[in-house]
Amino acid sequence: MSSIASVFGREILDSRGNPTVEVEVTLESGLRARAAVPSGASTGSREALEMRDGDKARYCGKGVTKAVDHVNSEIADALLGMDSLRQVQIDNTLIDLDGTDNKSRLGANAMLGVSMACARVAASFLGLPLYKYLGGINAKVLPAPMMNIINGGAHAPNNLDIQEFMIMPVGAMTFRDSLRMGTEIFHMLQAILKKDGHVTSVGDEGGFAPNLKNHDEAFAYIIKAIEEAGYNPGTEVALAIDAASSEFYKDGKYVLAGEGKTFNSAELSEWMAEFTRKYPLISIEDGMAESDWDGWGMLTASLGDHVQLVGDDVFVTNPSILAEGIAEGVANSILIKLNQIGTVTETLDTIEMAKEAAYTTVISHRSGETEDSFIADLAVGVNSGQIKTGSLCRSERMSKYNQLLRIEEELGDDAEFFGPMLAEYYSLGTEE
């Protein structure tokens, strides 16, 4: 009764109005589940391939009918009759069927939609919440949220080079309280920006995108919003950034157009270090470009003992690339994005490898999202401790936060919120 009776893909729209893949899997028992695939704006060059049609006469070339056709033909034929409870076997079948290193024949978007939907319907068959199915009986840690409240870089049409400025309400004792704190700070920031004459429209991930003098002004606005919301920066609320440095890495130099500065790797590392000295900055994502492994080594040597250095573009949720990074001592954390690798099994393998190497993990959304809340369950399932799923508006972001509220409620007294543990471990990014 847990065997797969049908696999059906369809083209839907994501939060940016671009097509994406949704897959529905039905079991012989009649149970059915669906999953929708996200899409990124700033992407690593070694990510698994997201298949687009390229037909400029339809959705400006961004249609996904080819990927959907693969779901409804080759993939469906290969999976019919398979046991939905055999996730590893299902994902290995998808990988073998594709036959490429980067999932370019079938498309990672086609494969991931199927993989996620199979996991969800299997959980339903067993009568388990998805997080318990993915993680087992010890799945209980509610992640500290990284809330993106000011956008720059590829996510906003302004003069900020850093892509994301985030708050982390680590002083809360529950996820529910951390969400409330973040929301209050978000609305306070909106009021402050509006009072100062800045536009308060939001970017792809729900953060504000004001034109500011420099990055220090962005930090200053956030600190002011934290304080005026009634919280203490550095004890109750920490900061995090996603520099997305690959986006401004040109010919071996880091060209910060908004700042009017050009840095080499050592200078950029020092620029980042200065932020950690001035602000309660505990986490820096993609502080160096994906191809600048020497720069990553410098940054890790400089800050790695007291700041979380998250590798996104440099690792692209790929276990073989992560293994290289661990061997080279690059970064101390990895961002986990399901669609960078293309199957649930490979994602879980990468998370396990990171944990064995004492790298932290941050479960992440993409800038082009859907209402699917799979990553909320994944974060709790693997006890990641951190999640990055956007700002405090836009329903495709709220769907993840609201699912975490439900999970915390369901876990009751067993729930553990990771915020205070994170704050203690990183000492809020201060230097002795």
Curated annotation (Swiss-Prot):
Domain of life: Bacteria
UniProt GO molecular function: magnesium ion binding; phosphopyruvate hydratase activity
Organism this protein belongs to: Desulfovibrio desulfuricans (strain ATCC 27774 / DSM 6949 / MB)
GO BP, one annotated term: glycolytic process
Cofactor: how and how many bound: Binds a second Mg(2+) ion via substrate during catalysis.
Protein name: Enolase
Catalytic activity: (2R)-2-phosphoglycerate = phosphoenolpyruvate + H2O
EC number annotated for this UniProt entry: 4.2.1.11
CDD domains for the chain: enolase
Keywords of the record: Cytoplasm, Glycolysis, Lyase, Magnesium, Metal-binding, Secreted
Protein's UniProt keywords contain Hydrolase: no
Cellular component per GO, a single term: extracellular region
Protein's cellular compartments: Cytoplasm; Secreted; Cell surface
Name of the encoding gene: eno
Listed Gene3D superfamilies: Enolase-like C-terminal domain, Enolase-like, N-terminal domain
Annotated family: Belongs to the enolase family.
Cofactor: Mg(2+)
InterPro entries, sorted: Enolase, Enolase-like_C_sf, Enolase-like_N, Enolase_C, Enolase_CS, Enolase_N
Coiled coil: none
Function: Catalyzes the reversible conversion of 2-phosphoglycerate (2-PG) into phosphoenolpyruvate (PEP). It is essential for the degradation of carbohydrates via glycolysis.
Binding site for (2R)-2-phosphoglycerate: 163, 337, 366-367, 388
Residues annotated for Mg(2+) binding in this entry: 242, 285, 312
Catalytic machinery residues: 205 (proton donor), 337 (proton acceptor)
Pathway the protein takes part in: Carbohydrate degradation; glycolysis; pyruvate from D-glyceraldehyde 3-phosphate: step 4/5
